[in-house]
């Protein structure tokens, strides 16, 4: 029985202070046993960083991730249909020790059920379902 804190990012944590992204400063100052990273990989991308690199950098410290895809900046898309590059991100997430993937989409250009089915198909295509 224990409590573990996780930090869920958006894009602003990738602004730099003294030449280093805020998220890196946070994760360097708080030990991994006290704080895990719960990267929202879509926001990592929107923040100007590469999700695969962040997963590799914090391998073993990222038990949960959010998959959120974007087209044209901040416009939501189904997983695999946007600019984040989840075909490369998914294997990197699994290699980093991710145990839980939360699919997140807040705006839809079709019904939420159609969008969920499209995102689900991404995971089927990659052998996770």
Language model regions located:
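Hydrophobic, well-structured mid-protein blocks that either form specific transmembrane helices
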Residues: 1-26
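Histidine-acidic metal/acid-base catalytic patches
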Residues: 17-39, 43-129
């Amino acid at each position: 029985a224990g409590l573990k804190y996780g930090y869920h990012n958006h894009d602003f944590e990738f602004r730099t202070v003294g030449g280093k992204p805020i998220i890196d400063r946070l994760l360097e100052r708080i030990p991994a046993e006290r704080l895990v990273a719960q990267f929202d990989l879509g926001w990592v991308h929107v923040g100007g960083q590469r999700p695969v690199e962040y997963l590799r950098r914090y391998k073993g410290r990222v038990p949960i991730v959010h998959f959120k895809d974007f087209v044209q900046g901040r416009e939501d898309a189904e997983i695999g249909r946007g600019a984040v590059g989840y075909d490369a991100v998914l294997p990197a997430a699994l290699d980093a020790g991710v145990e839980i993937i939360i699919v997140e989409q807040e705006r839809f250009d079709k019904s939420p059920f159609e969008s969920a089915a499209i995102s689900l198909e991404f995971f089927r295509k990659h052998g996770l379902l």
